């Protein structure tokens, strides 16, 4: 109650302060000459009133062809990325929440797996993404529901070039890793066509020191005189990932634009052995395969003060998990043959309307129809063909929103969003979100932002229907989130630009769903947790130009994220109350440092994660927590320009200081490793459109 009263007081007082400041600053423009070094940025977009947003620039997205969006998030945001190494499952903890609390969209279509509710960011090549941003906490309600932590928004777009274009990049790295990227494009004043392909392969056999095993040292009399941690090899982590992206755009030049985006992936990955596994890697095969197609047709109609867009899409995903063991004489027997088939039909309509330069109204309605079949082919079917393991279900998901945004003057802005969702036959209550921002000082473009929202997340299909263990009586997770922060931006033309932000967030999530063991020998989900996630997010960006063509860019983020279980104990032995959630670091930070001079460039990346607990009780034993770690990567690039082509040569060192670390318990990570990339872009006749 005290927090609510404080927020209401702030919402009441801040507009009055800003209106008063507006009266005092009506003659601010003539005084601009007194601060020549400061350039105040232009009018803030109506669509972004009060948003807490992080945008990734093209340098981060197009750094090299070996990177996935998991790598981009690791080094360019304060989100914790939980992964098992390259080409392994990579999920995120956004503001202290679980992976299923982060909603992910691609060109407007939600791509979270409907079975698990989460997204594997290792399956998204960063070279396929042209624009990406994070919407923190309450800000995600503008785009999608269910993002109790936030959302990741990704899109692709046309190059807007005339003529033919080609780009090819070949990468060779440690552990016999090969990466290839090819892009073909053609454009004229109406058409833009683009084809992109990424192929990554590797046996991925890296060595590591196994701190979960000890080998004895014997003297001549076979007495133990010492012990050491053995050096082992990751023999079962090979991967082969192929991604294809086809884009076709048609612009009438009269306000209408048609688009087609088609993305196909084919992945074959081994699942690596644990550091606690004493078996022989030749005695088993642990493999995950996936084939996914995502397609979107879009139409945009734009006029001077309004815009309409309609999209229709389809997702097909086939996933297989196979586990085989040697049963003797070299004969491999299937222990598990899990198969999942997901088909999703998608449709969305959006609109924007501007009125008198002070008002903006938006609407959006989206539908996702899922058809899911999950089974283990090794399990004998019951009578009637019903499986003992898995399920066969369909569910429709509707989401609609309307918003009104008002900017009474250049200093102040208000936004109200109302959203409602339906999953299956169950409707959520209305999801309100209120945003406000205001310019506190034009000198430095200091802006205050305040927002509050309600949100819900419905159980996933696995939560409800998986056999054995699914619980159809689960309640939807619900929560309230509060954000307040300050941002600034200053610059001096052709010299430097400096911007930054500080945000306090506070979230209360009730009926958190958790899978727990049962006395029947399997796990089942229950609504058992009330979680309080709060903290601070800091961001800073600096760009500086120096004489003789030197350019420096520095970006940094920091997050302090306590995420505490405040629910009731589920048993007398429950020691999780008042403790930090597993695999959520309290502190995380990342810095990128980019220095360029003419045709040379140096990129240094650093990230830090504090210790993470592996158990809800926050046990501090060797297996109860993972130590903090720092990661350092460095890249040097040289560009060459000839009459016939542009060439680039890039060398990367990952894990520069050969840090021994774990992101997930008992999963070894590679030490120092190297990559070289050679790129070529022929200079065919082409002009910017």
Regions inferred by a protein language model and the residue ranges of each:
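Membrane-embedded beta-barrel scaffold of Gram-negative outer-membrane proteins
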Residues: 303-323, 441, 449, 476-534, ...
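Short, acidic, small-residue-rich periplasmic hinge/interaction motif at the N-terminus
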Residues: 21-62, 99
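Extracytoplasmic beta-strand/coil segments of soluble accessory domains associated
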Residues: 70-110
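Periplasmic-side early beta-strands and strand-to-turn transitions of outer-membrane beta-barrels
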Residues: 186-286
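Face-selective signature of the C-terminal outer-membrane beta-barrel domain
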Residues: 249-267, 288-428, 435, 499-504, ...
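Gram-negative outer-membrane beta-barrel transporters
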Residues: 407-412, 503-508, 527-615, 646
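Short acidic/polar hinge/loop motifs at secondary-structure boundaries
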Residues: 109-137, 468
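N-terminal periplasmic accessory domains that precede
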Residues: 37, 69-72, 90-93, 105, ...
